[in-house]
């Protein structure tokens, strides 16, 4: 059987190192830099001939540069005769551009899927895709992992009144996600229907469900400028919720997000480390991080050994 070779792109080296440590591996030698004309340079520093290669690169920070770096790393490993190349993309880039929502709009998520395939990726591992149908954009296998087991564990360990909580989706699209968590905790759920005027601007919110005298836990796959979740927190408190938490898989936190969280009435805003959060945490004491490196590491181990990955949909590996 070929050996695992694990490479890290430059988007999230801390997460890559955590995954490597859990697998008992050293990260592979790779040098990524820019040429003087700003083209991306990648040098793979060890043989990958016949090996099972995994490249960890999240869709965050300088997204376009990081995506290009990932594509070049995949292609470099492929033409160096690796037996299989798996792109491990904790936060999938362009995932919100998954449909034609207005005239002449591009479906950029499909374009990214095509680019990964053409570069030479044989398999994709990602987490909490914005729309699970994105898996259908690929002609290669895609494992869409879920942060839900780690979220359930965090709720049980950190919210003492979790049996008196209510799980709330900040929009109708997240109803499936919150009902799954509510069922697993054996609590009720609610959702907030919002009418958007334009991107990143929230107009009117309608709460469906009774949150009075309960701990409200907002759950979503991502938060960008945080306008939606901060408005939702105000709505929940005015409807009688005793406390409000927000739990998100991908904390993008761009623009005014940090100041909005600081000014909002959250007990905590909990995110996973699919995106680096160290700098954001320095400016916001409410942000807490769930480490999901063990889920990615176990997915890599199971994929390499030809085992089922679906166990991870409902369990947190030790």
From Swiss-Prot:
Activity regulation (UniProt): Activated by magnesium and inorganic phosphate.
Disulphide linkage map: none
EC class of the enzyme, as a word: transferase
Binding site for ATP: 96-101, 130
Aminoacyl-tRNA synthetase listed as a keyword: no
Positions annotated to bind Mg(2+): 128, 130, 139, 143
GO terms assigned for molecular function: ADP binding; AMP binding; ATP binding; carbohydrate binding; GDP binding; identical protein binding; kinase activity; magnesium ion binding
Pathway(s) of this molecule: Metabolic intermediate biosynthesis; 5-phospho-alpha-D-ribose 1-diphosphate biosynthesis; 5-phospho-alpha-D-ribose 1-diphosphate from D-ribose 5-phosphate (route I): step 1/1
Cofactor(s) essential for the protein: Mg(2+)
Cited InterPro entries: PRib_PP_synth_CS, Pribosyltran_N, PRibTrfase_dom, PRTase-like, Rib-P_diPkinase, Rib-P_diPkinase_bac
GO biological process: 5-phosphoribose 1-diphosphate biosynthetic process; AMP biosynthetic process; animal organ regeneration; pentose-phosphate shunt; purine nucleotide biosynthetic process
Stored CDD domains: PRTases_typeI
EC code: 2.7.6.1
Region of interest (Binding of phosphoribosylpyrophosphate), residue spans: 212-227
Reactions mediated catalytically: D-ribose 5-phosphate + ATP = 5-phospho-alpha-D-ribose 1-diphosphate + AMP + H(+)
PROSITE patterns: PRPP_SYNTHASE (PS00114)
A cellular component annotation (GO) from this entry: cytosol
Free-text function comment from the UniProt entry: Catalyzes the synthesis of phosphoribosylpyrophosphate (PRPP) that is essential for nucleotide synthesis.
PANTHER family registered for this protein in UniProt: RIBOSE-PHOSPHATE DIPHOSPHOKINASE FAMILY MEMBER, RIBOSE-PHOSPHATE PYROPHOSPHOKINASE 2
Oligomeric form and interacting partners: Homodimer. The active form is probably a hexamer composed of 3 homodimers.
Name recorded for this polypeptide: Ribose-phosphate pyrophosphokinase 2
Phylogenetic classification of the source organism: Eukaryota, Metazoa, Chordata, Craniata, Vertebrata
Gene name, Swiss-Prot/TrEMBL: Prps2
């Amino acid at each position: 059987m070929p050996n695992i070779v694990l490479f890290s792109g430059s988007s999230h080296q801390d997460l890559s190192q955590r995954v490597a440590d859990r697998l008992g591996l050293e990260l592979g030698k790779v040098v990524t830099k820019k040429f003087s004309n700003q083209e991306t340079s990648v040098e793979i520093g060890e043989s990958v001939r016949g090996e099972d290669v995994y490249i960890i690169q999240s869709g965050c920070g300088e997204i376009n540069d990081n995506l290009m770096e990932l594509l070049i790393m995949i292609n470099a490993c492929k033409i160096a005769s690796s037996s299989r190349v798996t792109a491990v993309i904790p936060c999938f880039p362009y995932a919100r551009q998954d449909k034609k929502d207005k005239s002449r709009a591009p479906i950029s998520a499909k374009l990214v899927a095509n680019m990964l395939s053409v570069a030479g990726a044989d398999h994709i591992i990602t987490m909490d895709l914005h729309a699970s149908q994105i898996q259908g954009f690929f002609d290669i296998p895609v494992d869409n992992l879920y942060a839900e087991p780690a979220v359930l564990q965090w709720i049980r360990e950190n919210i003492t009144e979790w049996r008196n909580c209510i799980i709330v989706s900040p929009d109708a699209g997240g109803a499936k996600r919150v009902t799954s968590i509510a069922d697993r905790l054996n609590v009720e759920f609610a959702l907030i229907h919002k009418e958007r005027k334009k991107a990143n601007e929230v107009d009117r919110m309608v709460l469906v469900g009774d949150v009075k005298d309960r701990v409200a836990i907002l759950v979503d796959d991502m938060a960008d400028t945080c306008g939606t979740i901060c408005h939702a927190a105000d709505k929940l408190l005015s409807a009688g919720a005793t406390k409000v938490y927000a739990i998100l898989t991908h904390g993008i936190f761009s623009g005014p997000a940090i100041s909005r969280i600081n000014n909002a009435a959250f007990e905590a805003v909990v995110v996973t480390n699919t995106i680096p959060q160290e700098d954001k945490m320095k400016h916001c004491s409410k942000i807490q991080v769930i480490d999901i490196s063990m889920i990615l590491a176990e997915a890599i181990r199971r994929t390499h050994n030809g085992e089922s990955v679906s166990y991870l949909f409902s369990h947190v590996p030790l």
